[in-house]
Amino acid sequence: MDYAQSRLQARFGERPDDMLWQALEAVPERGVALEVARASGLRRWVAGISADADSHEIEIALRARWRECVTEISSWMPAGWQPATLWTSGLVDLPALCHLARGGRPLPWMFSDPLLQAYARADPMTRGRMLREDCGAFAGSSFAASGNAVLPAAPSPSSIRKAWLEEWRRRWPRWGDTGLLENLALLLDAALKQPAAIGRPELVRRLRSLFRRSVLRPVAAFIYIAFAALDMERLRTGLLKPALARDGIIAS
């Protein structure tokens, strides 16, 4: 874990502070926001995003950078931890999967996303069946039918969240010191279940506390990934606001 810890500490030190976020979010033009991001630790996230990209292109680019981030972090980890690390790439897919499970219409960018396009292109009934089968493949009894009960067309958002967390836990290698990892799992579950109940500042505070206690432990990688997800979400908001205004989706 020495190599992984040194890389994680370096990346953690590059994370934007409040002043940089304020500078990025204060600019009205996305081109300027991209310049601010490229001059900071956010530069990896905005690679490939042009000043004239529309909102859907921005979403696809950020999601691609996210998967690259998780893959890179996984490569730093001991082999036994790589399956669990790679599984976290699905963290940012959960809101989209829950949206589809509620019966929401696929958003335009979903048709271009490597993971979500199969769901987006399916008709509603097939989409629901696909969601249930894919969740059931790794959740086992959580999605099993009891007796002759008729299963709903799609799993509930809470079932998707639970199945994702169960599979993540299943991928943890045998390891005696799982206390901090369990604390992180509970924190992620609470944040995914009720995002408004745990505000961003409180979530960041708790993650920082866990990170300080995780030196040379595998959990440090997962805590950093959680930070990366928060940073991507905030960057997306900063970049999409002018793009959506330009596209006529929100008022400028």
Feature locations, PLM:
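N-terminal domain-start signal
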Residues: M1-S252
